[in-house]
C-alpha cells in the first residue's frame, strides 16, 4: 500500500512521469477492467501523426491552458492516441505541474475509443472530445493551429471510423451498435445545445437490461424538452447563446479544481489515503489515477442526472423558490465520480443460443476462476469490487450471495462448504422440528406461538405475490417462506418475526432455491440487520440519525431545510432503510442493489449514501416546493418505481468517497448493518408479546 | 369566519396487522380492492376531497404499519390528527382485544388537546369472510366496547365488497371536521360528543 502511495505521489508531482513511464498514464486512463497491460508501445511503435499546440483548458479562462503534443502511434496494427503536455510551459503560473500531469494521455489504444466528437466552429478554436468505450471522455483537446479535419482523416486511415447518423460531428470508432450514440449524445449539455428528440442517454446499466435501455431511450425526447424548459432555468448566468465549448470548459474546470482539491487532501492525510474510510484500509482504495480518469465523465453523468431527476418529478413547473446552492460547491458536478458499471459478473459468458443449464454452468465456471484449486476465494476484495461495480449475473447469485452475506467464509474450501451445508441442513431440520412438533392442543396454550404464526401467515401471502416465483394459490415457495420465517422466529426467539423480514427473505429464497440454504443466508443477513426489527427500534433510529448526519455533511442547506420544517427525524426514509429499498425498485433491480450493498466495498453503510443520493437528486424539488413533513413523506413514497438504480448507485459511490472519513465519523459505531458491538442482549425485550 | 376555515382534515387508521387498514383506505378513496396489498411499512396516506354543505375539504387518510413494534413511529405520524379510526377484524378476537392498546397508544403519542373528547370511530372489518360464519367478535360486544369509551361511532364493513365503507368515512370526515373546528375555536368544552349516536350502519348524527 505504501509503495503504491509513493508511486502515485511521484506521478502527481512530476509532470513528465506519465510521459516517461507509460505505466502512470496508462493506469490513469485505466479502462474498467483495470487490467490493461502496460504496453511498452514506444519501443517499436511507429509514429503516424504528430500535432503540436494541442491544448486543454483546466479552467474557464482561455488564458489558462496546458499546451502539448498530440500523437498517433501504431504498434502491432493497433493505433494509439497520446497527448503529452509540454514540460514547464504553462501559460499561467497558477497552473501547477500537477495540473498538467492530470491530463496526460499516454498511449490509449483505439480499441478502447468509442468515438470522437469534433467541434469546428467558424470562429474560435477547434477541438475534439475523445470518448472511451467505458463511457469516460477526455477533456476537449483544442487544436490551436487548426487541423481537426486532418487529424480525423489520419485516424480514419487506420481504424474504422463511421459518422454518426444522429450527429454529423460525431465519429464512431469500430462501432456496431447504437449505445455509442447514447454516449455521444449524452456528452451534450441540454442547457447549451438544442438536443434533438430521439437521442438517448448513456446506457443505464451496462447493457444488462436492454429492455430498460430501450424504454429509456424512447422516453428521452420528452425528457430533454422538459429539462430544457425547466431543469436548467434556475441556473444563474445561463445564456443559451454561449458556445458549447465555453460551457464545457467551465464544467471541466470546476471538476478539475474539485478533483485537485480532493486528491490533494487525499495525499496530505495520513498514508496518503486518509479520506478513505480507515476501517476499510485492507481493501483496495480507488487509486489516484483511476479517480482522475473519471473526471471527464461528468458530462454524461450530469445529463443523465438531469434526466433522471426530471423523470422523477414529472413536473415541468418552474419553481419560483430560490433554492440555496448545494454546499458541495459544484453540486451535480461533484457527483461525477462514480465509475460506470460493468455488466454483471458472469455476464460475458452469457449467450442466447445455449440452454439455461449450460448458461448456468458457464456462469459457474466464470466464478470458479476466482477460486483456488480447493475452492477458496483467492481475493475476496477483488470479488467484492467486481460485484460492487456491476452486480452478479443471476445464475451466479446462488454461488456468490452466501459469501457476501457471510454464510460462507471466503477462505473456506469446496469440501468445507459442502460439509457446512450438510451440517446446517440438519441443524435447520432440528430447528424446524421445534415448531412443527407443537400439537394443536399445545398451540392452544401457546399464545406467543399462535400469534407469531398468525402474523407470518398473514405476511407471506402478501409478499411479492405478483412476482412469478410466488404467484398463484397454494404456492410452495410461499409455504417455504412461511416455514423459514417461523423457524427463524424460533432460532432467534427474542427477535421473533417482524414485518419487513419477509421482504428480505423473498429474494434470498428465490435465489437460493433451497429452504435450508435460504434460512442460513437469512440468518447471516439478520446478524447485521436484525436490529432494524428490534422492539425498541433502536437500529432504525441509529440509522436515521446517521442519515441526518450524512445529509448535514453532504448537503447542509437541505439539512437546514429539514431542520426548519421539522423533518429531522427522517421518518420519511423509514421504508428505504428498514428493507433497504426493497419496495422502491423492481425485483431484479432490488437484487442488484442488495448485492452491491452487501459487498461493503466502500462502506458498510452504503445504503445510507444511497439515501443521500436520492434525496440530493430531489433537493430542488423538495425545497423549491417547500414540502412539509406530510408532503415529503408522500413524495418519497411515490418515488417508488421511479428511481434510476444505476445512476443513483454511482452518485452514492461519489458521495461516499467524497464524505470519506467525515462520513464514516458521522455514523455511530454499531449502526446496522455493522455487526453488533457487544454480545449483550441483542434484542431487548419489552412488553410487546410478539 | 372564512379565514379560519380548515381545509385539511387528518385521519389516522390504526389497528392490528392484516385487519384491512390499507384496503379500507383504498376502497374509500379509489373504490378498489386488491388481494395483493403488501404489508404497510412505515406510513403512507391518501387524500380525498369531501364536501359538507357548501364547503370543500381535503381528507388526508393515514395508513400505518400494524405491527406493535412500529408504534414508536406514531409520534411523527399521529400529530395534528383530527380523528382516529380504529379497525379490527371481526374474525379475530386478538385484533379486537388490542383496540384498547391502539387507542391508548394513540392518545399518548398524538397527545390531543382534549383527549377525553377526541373523536374515534371503530370499524369491524371483513364481515364478508365466510359469510360471517367465522366471525368471533359479535356486534353486541363491539358496541359495548364503543359505549365504554364514550360512545364511539361503530361501523361494520367489508373493504373487499365495499359494504358500509362510504358511510363509515362520511362519519369519520364529519367527526374530523368537528374536531378541527373545535380546535380552531378553542372551545373544546362546549361541544357534547357524548350523546348517543352509535347505531350501526346509520352513520353518525354528529
Curated annotation (Swiss-Prot), chain B:
CDD domains, per database record: Rab7
Any one of the GO BP annotations: late endosome to vacuole transport
Keywords recorded for this protein, A-Z: Endosome, GTP-binding, Lipoprotein, Membrane, Methylation, Nucleotide-binding, Prenylation, Protein transport, Transport, Vacuole
Record has Nucleotide-binding as a keyword: yes
Activity control, per UniProt: Regulated by guanine nucleotide exchange factors (GEFs) which promote the exchange of bound GDP for free GTP. Regulated by the MON1-CCZ1 complex which serves as a link between Rab5 and Rab7 protein families in PVCs and mediates PVC maturation.
Cysteine methyl ester: residues bearing it: 206
Signal peptide (UniProt feature, chain positions): none
Residues holding GTP: 15-23, 63-67, 125-128, 158-159
Lipidation (S-geranylgeranyl cysteine): 204, 206
Membrane topology: Lipid-anchor
Motif Effector region mapped to chain: 37-45
MF GO annotations: GTP binding; GTPase activity
Localization annotation: Endosome membrane; Vacuole membrane; Prevacuolar compartment membrane
Parts of the chain that traverse the membrane: none
Entry keyword annotation includes Lyase: no
Role summary: Essential for trafficking from prevacuolar compartments to vacuoles. Involved in the trafficking of newly synthesized protein to vacuoles. Essential for plant growth. Participates in the recruitment of the core retromer components to the endosomal membrane by interacting with VPS35A.
Family: Belongs to the small GTPase superfamily. Rab family.
Subunit relationships: Interacts with VPS35A.
Entry protein name: Ras-related protein RABG3f
Organism: Arabidopsis thaliana
Lineage: Eukaryota, Viridiplantae, Streptophyta, Embryophyta, Tracheophyta
